[in-house]
Amino acid sequence: MPKRQVFFSFEYYKDNWRAAQIRNMGKVSNDSTFSDNDWESVKKESDLAIKRWIISEMAKRSCIVVLIGATTSTRKWVKYEIEKAYELGKGIVGIYVHGLKDALGNQSSKGANPFYNVITKDGHRLSNYVTDYDTGYVTSKYVYSDIEEHLPDLIEEAIANADKY
C-alpha cells in the first residue's frame, strides 16, 4: 500500500492526546502508511495565518482524516478544514476517537457527526457520502487496535470515493 499524505483534523484541546495516538500509529515499527500535518506549529497564530497554513497543508495531502471526539463537530477550524478538503476534492473520512483514553486515562462521550453540517454543491449533507467510522469497542486498547487495523483501508476508500460527493 502506498504511503499517503494525510491531514488530521481534530479538536486540539480535548483530543490532542487521542489524536497523537493515531498520528503515531506505525511510527515505532516504521511501517506507517501515512504521514501527517503539524497543527501544533500554527495553533497560536492569527486566523488569517491559520487559514493560509490549512490551505498550504491541504494542498500537499490526498486525504483528510477527521478524528471525532465529544465536541469536534462544534469547532470552527474542523468545519473549515472539512469544507476546504471538500472544495479541493480530497478524500474525507471520520474516525470516532471517544473510546481512546486521554492523558489522564479517561474516555469521553461520543460526539456528533461533523460532516452533517457541511452541505455539498448539490444541496446534500456531506454526511450522506463520507464514512464516519466507529469501532464498536469500549475498551481503549481494542479501540486503538481496531483503528490501527482499519485506518489504511479507510484512507484508501476515502481517496477512491472523493469524486462521488
Functional labels for PLM-detected ranges:
Residues 5-7, 18, 103-165:
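C-terminal interaction surface of TIR/SEFIR-family domains
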Residues 1-60, 150-165:
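Conserved N-terminal substructure of TIR/SEFIR domains
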Residues 50-66, 116-126:
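A broadly tuned preference for mixed-charge, low-complexity surface segments
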Residues 57-87, 91-101:
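Conserved beta-strand-loop-alpha-helix hinge of the TIR/SEFIR fold
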Residues 40-47, 68-72, 99-105, 128-134:
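Low-complexity, flexible helical/coil segments
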Residues 21-24, 79-82, 107-110:
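Short, glycine/charged-enriched secondary-structure capping and boundary segments
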Residues 30-35, 58-60, 89-93, 117-121:
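Glycine-rich loops and low-complexity Gly/Arg-rich segments
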Residues 35-37, 95, 129:
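Conserved beta-strand termini and adjacent loop/short-helix elements that scaffold enzyme active sites
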